[in-house]
Amino acid sequence: MHSHVPAPSEEEIRSVVAPLLSLEGPLLPMLHALQETWGCVPQGAVPVLADILNLGRAEVHGVISFYHDFRDHPTGRHVLKLCRAEACQSMGANALAEETLRKLGIGWHGTTPNGAVTVEPVYCLGMCACAPAAMVDGRVVGRVDDARMDRILAEVGA
């Protein structure tokens, strides 16, 4: 989907964020638009956004690094988020995560060699009563056990 995209030009970055300039507090919507377009927030966007919004580069970078969902590199075709919060841990999430990462041969934030899936930690999906929980491309799945995880991995082509 987004892997191995060339770095966008300043003009391309400006064209993506221009429709959002009239918003109050446009930085977050701009970052989301850039990530939606390129699968990440391109490094070259930081000085462009700083210039457009009259902010320091450090301020823009600080916002990007504060929010865990913003990435500086593209993900796989699918994103699998595994809950790391206490309720899920008490229901076996740590063992499930370790086994999932072992099966895929990657670590946290890693992408499978075939580019199919990136695995990321998330801290609470709001599914505590159905722990352990996961999210696949924005779809929340509860009561994930080894068998269900195997089905999820097959579904995303891992």
Label for each model-derived stretch:
Residues 1-158:
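Signature of N-terminal electron-transfer/Fe-S-associated modules in redox systems
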